[in-house]
Structure formats: structure tokens, C-alpha cells
Amino acid sequence: MSSDSFDPSRTPPAEPEGIVRQRIRVTLRMLGSLLLGGMAIMGSVLVFRQGLLPLIDTVFQPGPAWLSVCRRAGIILVAIAGYWAYVHWHEKRKATELQLQPVALILGGVGGAALVALPIAMLFAFGAYELVLFRGASPALLGVAALIGIAATLEELVHRCLLFRLLERAWGTVVALAVQAVLFALPHLENVAHGGPGDIVAMLMSVTVLGLLWGGLFVLTRNLWVVAANHAAWNFTILLTGVPLSGIEDWRAVAPLESRYAGPDWLTGGIFGPESSLLAIVSTTVVVVLLLRAARRRGAFFKAAA
């Protein structure tokens, strides 16, 4: 056999070495940007809570109620300011994803409430959930609603505006959607730590689908407030019905309705609540498919960085 004859063992790799190095560089650059952006957001919140908030309390002495309002409003404002500063100084662009779009925001909120209200209504109709008592609204409900809104906005700021965008720029839309959805689900393991394997599997499935839902909505709208409104409305609607919200039992005491679940876990969602119900998972998956198809038709999908 001549030296220049074909030898399978000498077949070059599927990807040239230069492309591999380029992908490694892109990934490292993405990780560096992610670290910097995370530090900008979390650092701003830390400075506010440890420095500015105690100063406000000392100088103005607003009292516990108003100090709580300042804390909640301040956390959102400084987190967004930190993100804006990161985008402005590091990415050197306008943070268009922070622009308010009132009509789209309202539609996002209504859509989030309707999307989870439908399977919950079906669960009540099937007898899987039972209404025990109508308590009416309590003053504490407003405070919990504010916490839900803050948590939803912060989660979307970190997971969609920062994490997803940077993943998308490095690896493309499809891979970024999948990775951020899984990373969104993993922190929720703590909420079902006292449950069984079935609760854990159902939670991972349901929250991964939710990560795809809000990731897909961000791909379609490229707007923080639309996605945050959808997320917050989803959570608040669950709270109103008196069933567990993402495995959190504490807030059920302030819900206008007192409810209990009486069906099998695959139908009720078990300890995690209706988000892990098969009905909610299926209906949300259908909406995810529709969102991603609409986003693709708009040309909102991007390939990995070269």
C-alpha cells in the first residue's frame, strides 16, 4: 500500500482544529460575560441592601411598612440598573429588551393567567382539587403579590435577558433555549426535597417546560417586561386558588380560596402544585410549540457564533 493511499485511521476530524478552538474561545467569552453581568446585577442588589437601604432607614426612618416598600422597589430598580450598566459598558449597545411595551405587557400578563387558569379550572371540575372555604382577599395578599412580581422579574432578568441571550449569541437559539430551561429548573429541586422520586421527575419536567415557555416568549418579543408579566401572572393565579405554588406552602394562608387536592399526583401535581400536573405540562407544551413556530416565522432564531 502506498503512503498516500486511504487509511481510515488517518481520517481528519469532522471539525477542523481551528473551528474547535474558535468555539472554545466563544464559550469562554460567553462565560466571562455571564460572570460580569451576574456580578453587575447581584452586586448592585448587595450594595443596595447592605449600604443604601440601611442609610435610608437611618436618615428618613420610614417605619417598617414603608421600609419594606423601599426594599422591594429598590431591589428591582438597582438590579435593572446593574443590568443596564453591564449592557451599556460591556456590550456597548442599547438595552432594548428593557423598553416598556404597555400593550404587549398587558397581553403577556393576561396570557400567563389564562394559560394556568385553564388546567386549574379543569382540575377543580374533575374533582382533583376541592374548594374548602372562600376567605376573601386579605391585606397580606398585596405584599405577597409584590414579592411574586419581584421574584418573577429578577428570574427573567437573570435567566432570559442575561443567561439566555449570552448562550444564544455563543451557541445559537435552539441550544440556548434547551440549556437555559434546564438551568431554570434545577434550583427548584429544593422545593421538592421532601418529596419522592415521582415529585422530583414531575417537577423537573414541568419547570423545564416553563423555562421553554418563557424562553420562547422572550425569543418572540425580546422584551423583559412581557415575559416577567406572563411569569408573575402565572404564579399569582396559582396563589389565588389556594393550591401549592411551586411547592411553596407558606403563601397558601393568604389566598382568597382555601383548597385541597384529592386526586392522584400525576393529575394534581402533588406537592409542587398544578404546574406539575399532566394537564398543565401538556397545555404548556402546546403553547411552547406555537410560540417557537411564530418566532421562527419572524426570523427570530439565530445560529451559533462563527
Each language-model region and where it sits:
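N-terminal, membrane-interfacial amphipathic/helix-forming hydrophobic leader that caps
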Residues: M1-A95, I238-A306
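Juxtamembrane helix-loop-helix connectors linking adjacent transmembrane helices
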Residues: D4-P13, R25, L46-V69, H88-V158, ...
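Membrane-interface helix/loop boundary segments of multi-pass membrane proteins
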Residues: P13-V20, L154-V179, L183, E190, ...
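Aromatic-anchored segments of alpha-helical transmembrane domains
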Residues: M39-L46, V116-M122, A181-N191, A232-T241
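Residue-level recognition of membrane-helix boundary sites in multi-pass small-molecule transporters
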Residues: A104, V175, W225-V226, S276
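Residue-level signature of the transmembrane alpha-helical core
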Residues: G109, A113-A114, A145, G149, ...
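Juxtamembrane helix-entry segments on the extracytoplasmic side of multipass membrane proteins
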Residues: L133-A145, A193-S206, P274, L278
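Functionally important transmembrane alpha-helices
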Residues: V201-W266
